[in-house]
A protein has these predicted regions:
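Short, glycine-/Ser/Thr-/acidic-enriched flexible segments
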Residues: 126, 300, 336-339
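Key residue(s) within conserved catalytic/signature motifs
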Residues: 1, 43, 47, 76-77, ...
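N-terminal [4Fe-4S]-dependent radical SAM core
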Residues: 15-63
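Conserved non-cysteine loop/helix-boundary elements of the Radical SAM core domain that shape
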Residues: 81-280
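Beta-strand scaffold of nucleotide-dependent catalytic cores
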Residues: 66, 180, 248-252, 321, ...
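Canonical Radical SAM [4Fe-4S] cluster-binding loop centered on the CxxxCxxC motif
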Residues: 59-95
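A C-terminal junction/extension of Radical SAM enzymes
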Residues: 255, 259, 263-333
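Radical SAM enzyme core and accessory elements
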Residues: 1-8, 12-16, 20, 49-53, ...
Length: 389
């Protein structure tokens, strides 16, 4: 089976009135899925149903805010991001534009009669902003939206080399209910190999600071298949993450992305033969009380394997589910942002794209604001052609 959203197929078949037996045959017979993988996908679909129902209420939406800056570029990354040291002068003008775009999104959402459901500030690395810049951005969010009615507010605090106690306190003070601290691995050697300028101990210290700041819903990302890692090394990272007891642990499989340094250095998929054995260690998560709640795949992922979000009961990441299952409008702010407008139960969709690079986003910001008027227009008129950038 190929495709990004295998769980979506289960939801679609159920919505079409298929029996559970016919769905089983579809996956196990037609696509020859492994029973273990299919049972996981089906359990995820069962868990998601009430969450999707809540997120599918007409005219609800989630807000994504992108911060395309990082302290360094990881070897596996192909996202649009700027080196913080090289492009620091661009950061403040970018934040100023971003705040103005958030205000415009609020105006257009109100005009369209939309209700905010969740917020996600991602990147890049959002904590590459200074504490004052985080206050400016998150203050703008708080001034424009009633956070008491938001189901979830996530900020990626991914890297300990730019996440300190002050920033963690700001994130908490300004209303975030969920953060993500992303070690990827707890091996110092592997961290150095992928271009991370911090140690495993720095991750532990950052996690402790987050708990001291009062953060009660923390996700941690790990990647199976990183260069130089082993099955034993990945198991160590998994056990270390479990020992910290975060509410979420997301296990990604390495994807060989065309613009990443890994691919440019001509490393091949057969250099990562142990990745399936690494993912088999995820039984440790189930044994520790975590359960899978969302699943997706990407093109060029090692051995066509999957990315799975695991959580403790009651700590499912709503935004992750909504964006992956395409049941809800996502309004996006920032460079590279892709707004996805959804109506009529997913039968009508339209995208509005922001400019890809931060400098172009800043220089052509008036056009960014003009395009956002398409949000209200979408809900006033029939679906038209996609707006591209």
């Amino acid at each position: 089976m190929t495709g990004v959203r295998p769980v979506r197929l289960i939801h679609d078949k159920r919505a079409a009135g298929w029996s559970e037996e016919d769905i089983d045959q579809f996956f196990l017979g037609r696509f020859d899925c492994s029973r273990q993988k299919y049972q996981m996908a089906k359990a995820i679909a069962d868990l998601q149903e009430p969450i999707l129902k809540a997120g599918s209420v007409p005219k609800t939406y989630s807000l994504y805010i992108g911060i395309p800056f990082c302290p360094s570029r990881c070897s596996y990354c192909s996202f649009v991001s700027c080196n913080l040291d090289r492009d620091r002068k661009m950061v403040q003008p970018y934040v100023d534009c971003l705040c103005r775009e958030v205000e415009e999104i609020k105006a257009q959402a109100d005009k369209a009669g939309l209700t905010l459901c969740s917020i996600y500030i991602g990147g890049g690395t959002p904590t590459s902003l200074s504490a004052d810049q985080l206050r400016q951005l998150m203050g703008t969010v708080r001034e424009n939206f009633d956070l008491s009615k938001v189901m979830e507010y996530t900020v990626e605090a991914g890297r300990p080399d730019c996440t300190d106690a002050e920033k963690l306190a700001v994130i908490k003070e300004y209303g975030a209910t969920r953060i993500s601290i992303n070690p990827q691995t707890f091996s110092d050697e592997v961290l150095a190999g992928i271009g991370r300028k911090h140690s495993a101990q720095d991750i532990l210290d950052c996690y402790a600071d987050a708990r001291k700041a009062g953060h009660e819903d923390i996700n941690m990302d790990l990647i199976a298949g990183l260069p130089g890692d082993t099955v034993e090394g990945f198991e160590h990272s998994l056990r270390q993450a479990i020992a910290l007891d975060p509410e979420n642990i997301t296990v990604h499989t390495l994807t060989l992305k065309r613009a990443s340094r890994i691919v440019m250095e001509d490393q091949k998929e057969n250099d990562y033969a142990d990745v399936a054995a690494m993912l088999e260690k995820c039984h440790l998560l189930a044994e520790a009380g975590y359960r899978p709640y969302y699943l997706y795949r990407q093109k060029n992922t090692l051995q066509n394997l999957e990315n799975v979000g695991w959580c403790k009961p009651g700590h499912e990441g709503y935004y992750n589910i909504y964006i992956m299952e395409e049941v809800q409008t996502i309004l996006s702010a920032g460079a590279g942002g892709s707004t996805k407008l959804v109506a009529d139960g997913g039968k009508r969709m339209q995208r509005i794209f922001n400019f890809k690079y931060p400098n172009e986003y800043i220089q052509r910001f008036a056009e960014v604001l003009e395009r956002k008027k398409g949000v209200a227009d979408f809900y006033d008129h029939d679906l038209g052609p996609e707006t591209v950038g």
